[in-house]
Amino acid sequence: MSSTQDYIGEEAATRVKILSEALPYIQHFAGRTVVVKYGGAAMKDSNLKDKVIRDIVFMASVGIRPVVVHGGGPEINTWLDKVGIEPQFKDGLRVTDAATMDIVEMVLVGRVNKELVNLINQAGGKAVGLCGKDGQLMTARTMTNKDVGFVGEVSSVDARVVETLVKSGYIPVISSVAADEFGQAHNINADTCAGELAAALGAEKLILLTDTRGILRDYKDPSTLIHKLDIQQARELIGSGIVAGGMIPKVTCCVRSLAQGVRAAHILDGRLPHALLLEVFTDLGIGSMIVASGYDL
């Protein structure tokens, strides 16, 4: 019996210690906006999904203002298969004709978005689902010189609807679909949407959940994770080829958001349980943080 009591006491003491260490971060970030791009394995694994949702609700509960931007590639492929459309990609981009765009919008806006809203609400948060069309939050333009159909870039952002929601205590959950000036829906990369929205909101942080540890000096060796770097160092890593392949657009997205006023951008492994809390509320974090000059935390 005594050993059980000792165990319970030790566990409780550990929890108190963790909360105590997190307190300075909670105090510093209270009232500030954090944009989280949610995707990858953390979206497919139900156990990881539960932990991400709980992390987001925890952040809101301690006064941080989380905004969630999501994609949903695997579920799009599932539904394309159901209707007999074979997914096609070109240079890493989903070829999106009119029929595919209908499925993309149905899945991202009607299914994935509402599932995330429901999960956040069930966990004790207050979520509201949006896409780029709502309140003209984002206006798209067709990618030039790519020949991939209705795949877009962010032309402009009007973040007032999101600002209204976060100031009222809601957690906006935004799918990466937006219309162009003629009303045509476009599929936009969720990282890009998150970065541009973070800039428009003047966010404290942009966090990209990915399927890699972060920025590695040697992509084959997780122990070479770079925990903190500035904009110039990030650009140099791209120029030297250390940042390569699919990591280039993610780092570029982070750098662009920082150049527009976001204070810090993080790339972290969403496959790690409670990755968000570990990154935001611990000294070292678990991913890579790119910062604007003069950033202390």
From Swiss-Prot:
Binding of substrate, residues: 72-73, 94, 187
GO CC field: cytoplasm
Pathway where this protein functions: Amino-acid biosynthesis; L-arginine biosynthesis; N(2)-acetyl-L-ornithine from L-glutamate: step 2/4
EC number: 2.7.2.8
Alphabetized UniProt keyword annotations: Amino-acid biosynthesis, Arginine biosynthesis, ATP-binding, Cytoplasm, Kinase, Nucleotide-binding, Transferase
Subcellular compartments: Cytoplasm
The gene coding this protein: argB
Gene Ontology MF terms: acetylglutamate kinase activity; ATP binding
Family that this chain belongs to: Belongs to the acetylglutamate kinase family. ArgB subfamily.
Record organism: Synechocystis sp. (strain ATCC 27184 / PCC 6803 / Kazusa)
Entry superkingdom: Bacteria
BP term (GO), one: L-arginine biosynthetic process
Alphabetical list of InterPro entries matching this protein: AceGlu_kinase-like_sf, AcgluKinase_fam, ArgB, Asp/Glu/Uridylate_kinase, Glu/AcGlu_kinase, NAGK-C
Function text: Catalyzes the ATP-dependent phosphorylation of N-acetyl-L-glutamate.
Pfam families (UniProt xref): AA_kinase
Broad class of the protein's primary localization: cytoplasm
Residues carrying the site annotation Transition state stabilizer: 37, 250
Catalysed reaction equations from the record: N-acetyl-L-glutamate + ATP = N-acetyl-L-glutamyl 5-phosphate + ADP
Record's protein name: Acetylglutamate kinase
